[in-house]
Amino acid sequence: MSEINAGFAPAETDVAASGDDLLGRTLDRIPFSVYHLLLVVILGLVGFVEGYDTAITGALLVLARGPLHLTAADTPWLVVVPTAAVVASVFVGSLLNDRFSRKNLMQFGIVVTTLFTLLIPLAETADQLIALRILGSIGVGFAIPAAYPIGAELLPAQHRRTFATIYELVLATAFVLLPFLGFLLAHNPDGFRLIALPGGLALFVVPVLVHFIVPQSPRWQLSRGRAGAAAATVNWMIARAGGAIAALDPAVLTRGPARASAALPPYAALFRAGQLRFTIVGVLCGVSSTVAYYIFAFLLPRALEAQGAAVSLSFGLSSLLFLATLPGKVLVGFLMEAIGRRWTILFALLGAVPGLLLMAIAHLTGNLAAIVFSIGALITGMTVLSSFPATRMYLSEQFPTALRGRGHFLGETVARLLGGVVAPFLLAPYIGSPVIFFGSVLIVVAIGALPPLLYGKETVGQLEGVARTGAPAGAPSA
């Protein structure tokens, strides 16, 4: 535990604190206020956009099958290809991030995603639906990975778990809402049109709130040599939070290394000695949970139907699985500060093994199958599907400010490529086999639990240490 608590040690021991330290220290000293809570909720709505865009795939596979005459050949086009578009756009975003405003990239992505979701009710053929899903998925790649670097850089150290937890809770509501709406609309021929409206209508709400409530990241502004803009942003946040501390003098932010060119380190810096180990660990920590996330969001309703469940029951069990993530993410949010990111990730991933086993063998229990599956779904929902507050924040904390956006986007690219493209493509032919379907997820989750604990370092409260050293504070060079 001393390793964890060391992350909260003040930086005043520095002989001459740099501008990065002073800015970070000032942000951490702003008392948590209604403004901070509003900021967290607005970023959480971005999570709703992500959750709705992902979870709607499973609903569309069922609800649009009759009205649009979807065939088995259309499944990869609705599941794999849009996710491949997300991966491609995340990678493009990783090249642009750190160089351009995280907020502006996020706004672009939100508008594109919600616009094409809003157009889904107009689809008259399977090809039109597929095209809209692919175009909307391009926006997801720009919007979603930006939220965690922004949250990590705006929130005081002790409240980053607050952001991560609320963000993931709002995201989880989309996964609970979609199967529930699918259950209600299961026999409505226009069900696939109606179910797209909540995600599409967010176009008129979320971008407006982000524009007026979420500031540019002052840490990013300072990393680009804009000390005056960084100080102005911090002082704006101080005023919005009640003005409880003194304003920040822009002059103090020029301390430390010269920023004449404000040149960014190259993308290759993510793989240099001293950073490579933490890049790999940060990327790997989210892959297992992302595989489970996408498999269940995309294929679970269809898999349960293929395994003999009624359409309404398949939606009901899927909704139960994601409903369990609401208390699960609160628990993970508490644990990630109490016992650290790494031990929390281990708990969340290994804790899912019993639940996945129960879901895999539920079909063997006769009349008790629904009960056994429900127990397994509750366990799995409260563990691996609730791990994202820890895994995503841990990923963002692996990188210094000048690499954070690109590093986080890289992690999201790899996780979504493996979880949202490769895994569904490989498992889609076997959705009728409970042992193969759930057993494959179990193996991936069990293997992925160990790298952060064995090779990673604790990062709680060490964002400025990462900014100085390029690796989590106290970590030896690779």
Question: Locations of the language-model features?
Answer:
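Intracellular cytosolic loops and amphipathic helices of Major Facilitator Superfamily
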Residues: 1-29, 211-274, 462-478
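Extracytoplasmic gate region of multi-pass secondary transporters
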Residues: 57-58, 271-329
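Helix-breaking motifs and short loop linkers at transmembrane-helix boundaries and internal kinks
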Residues: 69, 101, 122-128, 156, ...
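Conserved MFS/SLC helix-loop-helix module at the cytosolic interface between two early adjacent transmembrane helices
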Residues: 88-126
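Helix-to-loop junctions at the C-terminal end of transmembrane segments
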Residues: 90-101, 329-341
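C-terminal ends and interior cores of transmembrane alpha-helices
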Residues: 111-124, 183, 351-366
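Glycine-rich segments within core transmembrane alpha-helices of 12-TM secondary carriers
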Residues: 161-187, 197, 201-203, 412-422
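C-terminal transmembrane helical hairpin of 12-TM major facilitator-type secondary transporters
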Residues: 340-391
